[in-house]
């Protein structure tokens, strides 16, 4: 045998495309052997349905026509039983009868079209593949209904052009290699090539997204006469025609077919476009008309009534975009929640440049920003934070709400600038390198003095290489009265179990996270408009929330004054009163960001109180906070470099390590304000009644250089005592807590011990430390 014959004998036939494939190109994981190309084209999750559809059509077609091969050869050892003469004659008679029926259907179809041509009669049309029996059509329709319930792929509005006769089924039946035989006069060669890449976009999308087996019959005659009804495959029809009866209303062209895109409006309950009507309920109408062309054409137009509203089923790209938007917003809210939860501890741990920059910027929030190319697109910056990856420098992170009042949170300037660009230009493909040169901020609300955000936050400031520019560049805080609820309040409200007595009640169900993003969104309507009753309920809750915010503004002022935000003027004789805490245990009734418009933000006031206390107690750096530093470091596994392991500190705080007993707050002149402060405040400058002292020698500790046991918060040691303990235990072996105890790590029985690098830092050259890599 020749090499070509050997190669052809090794090839297998794909069940779908019926092409000879090498064994390595075949996949045997499904009910039929299929090639990798078909699996990649249809998708592994839908290939079984396509195989089942092809199987039903092959059975109804009467085995394999047009010289199609019967598929892969039988396995070795299986004998093929030859048909008897009687069975062969019966099969031949059945095939001949079916061919006559198909010719009759083709003649009737050409008579209906009114544009019969010799070329069309000579070449078999692509529609002859649809000659199914009634039983097969019913079975295929049932399978299609089941498939729609499983996958529910809403197709985009489809226009069936003049090449509808040459459109191919997704299972690739109807001719050699699964494609129909084009006639010489059926159009340009681009339309007759019939490869998946060169087929029309409408047919390709319909065959990929709207794959349904079975036929849709009963459509009226395009000519309006009483001739036979058209038989159109369902993958070439919009999904709205498959789920409900058609009415006789003439509809405007859908979006993308010459019609202008109007503003989307919510639909009433049960109307097309509502969430319960996806897929096309009764009321969605379609018209089928004929267009004068060389071949027959069927144009289906989908709409909702005569008002020009959007159809109930939107394209899958819109749905994917909305899903990605919800996921992005949820991730941004999670980052915001994490930032707020650990802000009090982590900010105090950061270097002085980082801390000062964050304090300065936090004192300016919230302030408005807009898109440079379209001034109607407004958002607001409401929070800042500093993040760092291991081995990297700190980088500024800002949280922006866009549109204003929507609850949509973006954790980067480039993200919000990209969304603004898409809303402005309707271009979803372009990405922006840096959002700071596309955003402008208003220095003072109402002044019209808009400046580039990149001038306020240049790259040197964003990486904390330089300080914030002068005061003439800083914006003034402005809280819009029409939407006073900031996303930080939504995050804190989601964690607050109840409102303290005497301070007003929380609304019954404040939407948080994704719920807030969907119910407060103003940028564009969701592709699934909410039910009118739900929207009315959410609107009522929003009004109640805003009214509650307005009523509690005075309470916030009293809380700030009574809770220690005026602590710089507090007498040094008594312990300072605790401020409203930040974090997951906060029960405040009013979010901190809804403070008076011209006053400092509560976060900035809290940090200024900490700085003031650090100046009073520390002979060293006046701006550092020793107690906050120690409390933030007490859960760190490294007493020297605690900032490198923030994850363990957070884990310890979640495991309940922070539930310390704290003295009750001092009496307040305003009843009802005392319950605002929880009783489980972590170890902080407000909770410590005295200065930090060494556990062994009881001497005052330096605010930045001392050893903290990560297991026992009260174990704090100065460097001299730690050095003596390390020498006594032996620096070359395991060195445990300087207290003499083997303090177990959080959540385990393993005792905590110094690392070799920590020992070397504490000893500072007094004793040669054995390196971990030394033999």
From Swiss-Prot:
Keywords linked to the UniProt accession: Coiled coil, Isopeptide bond, Metal-binding, Nucleus, Phosphoprotein, Transferase, Ubl conjugation, Zinc, Zinc-finger
Biased composition (Low complexity): 93-108, 195-207, 283-300, 501-519, 627-646
A biological process term (GO) from this entry: nervous system development
Coiled-coil ranges from the UniProt annotation: 83-113, 314-350
Cross-link (Glycyl lysine isopeptide (Lys-Gly) (interchain with G-Cter in SUMO2)) at residue(s): 79
Biased composition (Pro residues): 263-272, 574-583
Domain of life assignment: Eukaryota
Catalytic activity, as annotated: S-ubiquitinyl-[E2 ubiquitin-conjugating enzyme]-L-cysteine + [acceptor protein]-L-lysine = [E2 ubiquitin-conjugating enzyme]-L-cysteine + N(6)-ubiquitinyl-[acceptor protein]-L-lysine
Comp. bias regions, Polar residues: 586-600
Alphabetized GO MF terms: ubiquitin protein ligase activity; zinc ion binding
GO cellular component, as recorded: nucleoplasm; nucleus
Pathway note: Protein modification; protein ubiquitination
Family label: Belongs to the IRF2BP family.
Protein name per Swiss-Prot or TrEMBL: Probable E3 ubiquitin-protein ligase IRF2BPL
Organism field: Mus musculus
């Amino acid at each position: 045998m020749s090499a070509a014959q050997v190669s052809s004998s090794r090839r297998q036939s794909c069940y779908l495309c019926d092409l000879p494939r090498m064994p390595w190109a075949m996949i045997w994981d499904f009910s039929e052997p299929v090639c990798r190309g078909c699996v990649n084209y249809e998708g592994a999750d839908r290939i079984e349905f396509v195989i089942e559809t092809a199987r039903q059509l092959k059975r109804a077609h009467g085995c394999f026509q047009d010289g199609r091969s019967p598929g892969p050869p039988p396995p070795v050892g299986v004998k093929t039983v030859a048909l008897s003469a009687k069975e062969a004659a019966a099969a031949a008679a059945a095939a001949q009868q079916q061919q006559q029926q198909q010719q009759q259907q083709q003649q009737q179809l050409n008579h209906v079209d009114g544009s019969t041509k010799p070329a069309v009669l000579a070449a078999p049309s692509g529609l002859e593949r649809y000659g199914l029996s009634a039983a097969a059509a019913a079975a295929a329709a049932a399978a299609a209904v089941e498939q729609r319930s499983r996958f529910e792929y809403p197709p985009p509005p489809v226009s069936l052009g003049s090449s509808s006769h040459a459109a191919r089924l997704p299972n690739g039946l109807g001719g050699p290699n699964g494609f129909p035989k084009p006639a010489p006069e059926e159009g340009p060669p681009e339309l007759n090539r019939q490869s998946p890449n060169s087929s029309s976009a409408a047919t390709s999308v319909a065959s990929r997204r709207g794959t349904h087996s079975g036929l849709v019959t009963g459509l009226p005659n395009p000519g309006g006469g009483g001739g036979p009804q058209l038989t159109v495959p369902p993958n070439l029809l919009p999904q709205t025609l498959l789920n409900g009866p058609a009415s006789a209303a003439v509809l405007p062209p859908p979006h993308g077919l010459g019609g202008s895109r109007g503003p989307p409006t919510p639909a009433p309950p049960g109307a097309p476009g509502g969430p319960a009507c996806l897929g096309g309920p009764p009321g969605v109408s379609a018209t089928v008309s004929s267009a004068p062309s060389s071949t027959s054409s069927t144009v289906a137009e989908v709409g909702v009534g005569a008002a020009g509203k959007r159809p109930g089923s939107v394209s899958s790209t819109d749905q994917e975009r909305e899903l990605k938007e919800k996921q992005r917003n949820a991730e941004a809210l999670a980052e915001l929640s994490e930032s707020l939860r650990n802000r009090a501890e982590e900010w105090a741990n950061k270097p002085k440049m980082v801390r000062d920059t964050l304090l300065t910027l936090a004192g300016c929030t919230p302030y408005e920003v807009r898109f440079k190319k379209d001034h109607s697109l407004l958002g607001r910056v409401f929070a800042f934070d500093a993040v760092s990856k291991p081995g990297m420098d700190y980088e500024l992170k800002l949280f922006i709400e866009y549109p204003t009042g929507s609850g949509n949170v973006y954790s980067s300037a480039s993200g919000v600038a990209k969304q603004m660009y898409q809303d402005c230009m309707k271009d979803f493909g372009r990405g922006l390198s840096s959002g700071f040169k596309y955003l402008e901020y208003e220095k003072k609300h109402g002044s019209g003095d808009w400046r580039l955000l990149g001038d306020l936050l240049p790259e040197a400031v964003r990486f904390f290489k330089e300080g914030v520019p002068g005061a003439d560049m800083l914006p003034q805080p402005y809280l819009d009265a029409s939407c006073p609820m900031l996303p930080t309040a939504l995050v804190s409200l989601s964690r607050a179990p109840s409102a303290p007595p005497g301070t007003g009640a929380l609304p019954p169900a404040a939407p948080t996270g994704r719920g807030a993003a969907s119910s407060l969104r103003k940028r564009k309507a969701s592709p699934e408009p909410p039910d009118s009753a739900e929207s009315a309920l959410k609107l009522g809750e929003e009004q109640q929330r805003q009214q509650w915010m307005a009523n509690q503004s005075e309470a916030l002022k009293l809380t700030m004054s009574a809770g220690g935000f005026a602590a710089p003027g507090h007498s040094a004789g008594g312990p300072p009163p605790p401020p409203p805490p930040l974090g997951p245990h906060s029960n405040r009734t009013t979010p901190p960001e809804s403070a008076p418009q011209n006053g400092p933000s509560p976060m900035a006031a809290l940090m200024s109180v900490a700085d003031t206390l650090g100046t009073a107690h520390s002979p060293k750096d006046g701006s550092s906070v020793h107690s906050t530093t120690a409390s933030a470091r007490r859960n760190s596994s490294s007493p020297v470099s605690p900032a490198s392991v923030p994850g363990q500190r957070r884990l310890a705080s979640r495991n309940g390590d922070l539930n310390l007993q704290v003295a009750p707050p001092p009496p307040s002149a305003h009843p009802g304000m005392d319950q605002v402060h929880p009783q489980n405040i972590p170890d902080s400058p407000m909770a410590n009644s005295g200065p930090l002292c060494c556990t062994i020698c009881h001497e005052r500790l330096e605010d930045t250089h001392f050893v903290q046991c990560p297991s026992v918060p009260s174990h704090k040691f100065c460097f001299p005592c730690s050095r003596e303990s390390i020498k006594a235990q032996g620096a070359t072996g395991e060195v445990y807590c300087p207290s003499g105890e083997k303090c177990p790590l959080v959540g385990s029985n393993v005792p905590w011990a110094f690392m070799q690098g920590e020992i070397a830092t504490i000893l500072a050259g007094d004793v040669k430390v054995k390196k971990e890599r030394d033999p």
